[in-house]
């Protein structure tokens, strides 16, 4: 099984990349949260190898935690690799785990193809499994401050997914000023683009 690839990008398209490693090109499917490097640059991916009777597919992730979450999602009845990639493309790692642990069906239903029944099944089957993966999540910002920050980032042209990812990963503090939190979010979003 292939678990990790590091190589040069020789071709890329939306949610797909071919990495050349040791003279071999590996076609890897990735969630939209993976920022693909330009052709010719190096890229590292943690890989899940999905084997079916008639094919072998590689799914790549920027962190081992995301790869493990993908594998955990596949354990849910009715969730295949396409649905799992769709979930990880729509919600950040932390946001998804928080939605499961806090049983927020409304957040899960925002993912295309996830209705109320599937959202409830995800919560039921994953809540116990994801407690170990949850880490120490800081309490989210109060709704009004979170909304102000989201609105500010949206006015700068960032997508809902980018905003959600920045809110989850940019070391934004409850006691920080709006200006400080905007700077941190922009710093995070800027570092992802490079």
From Swiss-Prot:
Transmembrane segments: none annotated. SMART domains: HhH1 (SM00278). GO terms for biological process: DNA recombination; DNA repair. One of its GO terms (cellular component) is cytoplasm. Residues 136-140 are annotated as: Flexible linker. Keywords: Cytoplasm, DNA damage, DNA recombination, DNA repair, DNA-binding. It comes from the Bacteria. InterPro entries: DNA_helicase_Holl-junc_RuvA_I, Hlx-hairpin-Hlx_DNA-bd_motif, NA-bd_OB-fold, RuvA, RuvA_2-like, RuvA_C, RuvA_C_sf. Residues 141-194 are annotated as: Domain III. Residues 1-62 are annotated as: Domain I. Residues 63-136 are annotated as: Domain II. Its main location: cytoplasm. The keyword Lyase does not apply. It holds the Pfam family HHH_5. The keyword DNA repair applies. It is found in: Cytoplasm. NCBIfam families: ruvA. The RuvA-RuvB-RuvC complex processes Holliday junction (HJ) DNA during genetic recombination and DNA repair, while the RuvA-RuvB complex plays an important role in the rescue of blocked DNA replication forks via replication fork reversal (RFR). RuvA specifically binds to HJ cruciform DNA, conferring on it an open structure. The RuvB hexamer acts as an ATP-dependent pump, pulling dsDNA into and through the RuvAB complex. HJ branch migration allows RuvC to scan DNA until it finds its consensus sequence, where it cleaves and resolves the cruciform DNA. Belongs to the RuvA family. Homotetramer. Forms an RuvA(8)-RuvB(12)-Holliday junction (HJ) complex. HJ DNA is sandwiched between 2 RuvA tetramers; dsDNA enters through RuvA and exits via RuvB. An RuvB hexamer assembles on each DNA strand where it exits the tetramer. Each RuvB hexamer is contacted by two RuvA subunits (via domain III) on 2 adjacent RuvB subunits; this complex drives branch migration. In the full resolvosome a probable DNA-RuvA(4)-RuvB(12)-RuvC(2) complex forms which resolves the HJ. Has three domains with a flexible linker between the domains II and III and assumes an 'L' shape. Domain III is highly mobile and contacts RuvB. This is Holliday junction branch migration complex subunit RuvA. The gene is ruvA.
């Amino acid at each position: 099984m292939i678990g990790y690839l590091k190589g040069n990008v020789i071709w890329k398209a939306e949610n797909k990349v071919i990495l050349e490693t040791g003279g071999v090109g590996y076609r890897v499917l990735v969630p939209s949260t993976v920022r693909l490097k330009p052709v010719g640059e190096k890229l590292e991916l943690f890989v899940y190898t999905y084997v079916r009777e008639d094919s072998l597919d590689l799914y790549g992730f920027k962190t081992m935690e995301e790869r493990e979450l993908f594998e955990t999602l596949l354990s849910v009845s009715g969730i295949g690799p396409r649905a799992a990639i769709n979930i990880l493309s729509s919600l950040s790692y932390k946001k998804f785990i928080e939605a499961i642990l806090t049983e927020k069906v409304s957040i899960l239903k925002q993912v295309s193809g996830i209705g109320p029944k599937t959202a409830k099944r995800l919560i039921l089957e994953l809540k116990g499994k994801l407690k170990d993966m949850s880490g120490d999540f800081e309490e989210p910002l109060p709704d009004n401050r979170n909304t102000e920050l989201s609105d500010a980032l949206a006015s700068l042209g960032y997508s809902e997914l980018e905003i959600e990812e920045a809110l989850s990963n940019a070391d934004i503090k409850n006691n920080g000023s709006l200006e400080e939190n905007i700077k941190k979010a922009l710093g995070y979003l800027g570092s992802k683009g490079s």
